[in-house]
């Protein structure tokens, strides 16, 4: 083999090796340590990159029904929100109208364009059917028809019922404490004739979703997998319209329901609710994802991240055992100079459900000094567990054996021993020992199991 060929082969092998090394490294291109966990950046918390979700979405949030936020990515930045706008459309409609009411489709609704269920001018349908088409298939035509009908109910004297409805959307937004949201239409279109300043934030959209989710009627539409809706044509004939379920993870891995959205500026959007035991429900919203599959993959990643970072933290942990149970501590028996009493956990199964990225978990062991007679199982201390300074649980410590005080001869021997200890500068009684330990929470959660 000539030298030129050898050199070329060597260069090729080196390049292949480097490429293999690069590909072998885990890719975290969409994992950001600037993302917030419980309001603090992952970097400030010292959270390892592998503990964070890898998502394509540019804006995202995970929020509990009580409003506590567990994860944020640019959640308070103003963005286009596409058809997640329709969550507020449904909420305002249910605030002011009964689902059994009948509405009529006008020319504006029938010709709005883009994602539509196929309504025609003059069609009539119940608000219930309209809300089904709104939440299941994201119909812009039903959104417009709803706005005109409900606006007329809000202010029968208004010459612009559509505008009245938009004002009601923004008034409701203010009531919910949203910080940066403006609605300009009931469907979320943001291009062509609809170019404007309609915007919100991931946080605000989730606030709106959480409020709507409290409404039982809204949940029935948001959770619906209906494949058709029913209308009456202008000539009085009944007509069924096929529906495509936009939420492709409905019923999967705990997804109870949601609302999709998509425009060029907003990207792929989704706001939804999951429920998995024992944590229960949580709301998730994301915006600016890539492609329909990417949107739902991101959503499932966030759900798995949230639920995967909860774990049962066992309290009764120790490197030592006595009688087959964990040894928590040894307590000083003050009537004796050299005796210690084994203390075990009163409830060996005691545990607390914790969010493993929620901050430092600490234990405080308090051991009583024992004097006199004690039966086995006597309370003799406790271990209290805190996370970020808040108590998450405690467990009582009890004596593993009986304790008898010294008789007269034993007492004299103890006094003599203490005299010797005094000259040797040793303590008059044996010193307590602590064996209870705190497991690393991240070692027991399911995120990277």
Predicted regions and their residues:
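Sec-dependent N-terminal signal peptides of Gram-positive bacterial secreted proteins and lipoproteins
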Residues: 2-26
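Hydrophobic alpha-helical membrane context
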Residues: 15-18, 98, 310
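Catalytic-site microenvironment of enzymes
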Residues: 22, 70, 449
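Active-site-adjacent loops and short helices of periplasmic peptidoglycan-processing enzymes
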Residues: 29-216
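Domain-terminus/edge residues, biased toward the C-terminal soluble/receptor-binding domains
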Residues: 196-449
């Amino acid at each position: 083999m000539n030298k030129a060929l050898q050199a070329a082969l060597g260069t090729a092998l080196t390049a292949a090796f480097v490429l293999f090394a690069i590909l072998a490294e885990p890719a975290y291109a969409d994992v950001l340590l600037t993302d917030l966990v419980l309001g603090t950046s992952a970097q400030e918390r010292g959270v390892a990159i592998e503990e964070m979700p890898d998502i394509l979405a540019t804006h995202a949030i995970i929020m509990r029904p009580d409003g506590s936020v567990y994860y944020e990515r640019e959640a308070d930045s103003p963005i286009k929100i596409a058809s997640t706008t329709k969550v507020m459309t449904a909420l305002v409609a249910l605030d002011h109208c009964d689902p059994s009411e009948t509405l009529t489709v006008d020319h504006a609704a029938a010709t709005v364009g883009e994602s539509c269920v196929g309504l025609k001018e003059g069609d009539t349908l119940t608000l219930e059917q309209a809300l089904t088409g709104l939440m299941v298939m994201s119909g812009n035509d039903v959104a417009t028809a709803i706005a005109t009908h409900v606006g007329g109910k809000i202010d029968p004297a208004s010459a612009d019922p559509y505008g009245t409805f938009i004002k009601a959307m923004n008034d409701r937004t203010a009531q919910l404490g949203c910080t940066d949201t403006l609605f300009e239409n009931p469907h979320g279109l943001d291009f062509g004739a609809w170019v404007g300043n309609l915007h919100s934030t991931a946080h605000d959209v989730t606030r709106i979703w959480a409020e709507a989710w409290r409404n039982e009627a809204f949940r029935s539409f948001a959770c619906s997998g209906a494949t058709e809706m029913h209308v009456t044509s202008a000539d009085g004939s009944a007509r069924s319209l096929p529906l495509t379920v936009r939420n492709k993870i409905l019923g999967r891995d705990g997804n109870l329901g949601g609302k999709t959205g998509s425009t060029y500026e907003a990207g792929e959007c989704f706001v939804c609710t999951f429920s998995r035991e024992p944590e229960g429900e949580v709301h998730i919203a994301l915006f600016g994802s890539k492609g329909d599959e990417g949107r739902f993959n991101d959503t499932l990643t966030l759900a798995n991240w949230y639920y995967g970072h909860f774990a049962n933290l066992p309290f009764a942990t120790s490197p030592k055992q006595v009688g087959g149970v964990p040894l928590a501590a040894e307590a000083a028996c003050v009537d004796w100079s050299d005796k210690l009493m084994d203390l075990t956990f009163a409830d060996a199964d005691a545990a607390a459900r914790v969010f493993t990225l929620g901050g430092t978990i600490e234990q405080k062991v308090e051991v009583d000094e024992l004097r006199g007679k004690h039966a086995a199982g006597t309370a003799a201390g406790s271990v209290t567990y805190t996370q970020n300074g808040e108590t998450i649980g405690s467990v009582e410590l009890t004596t593993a054996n009986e304790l008898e005080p010294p008789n007269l001869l034993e007492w004299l021997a103890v006094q003599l021993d203490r005299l010797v200890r005094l000259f040797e500068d040793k303590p008059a009684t044996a010193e307590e020992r602590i064996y209870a330990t705190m497991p690393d929470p991240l070692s027991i959660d399911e995120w990277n199991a």
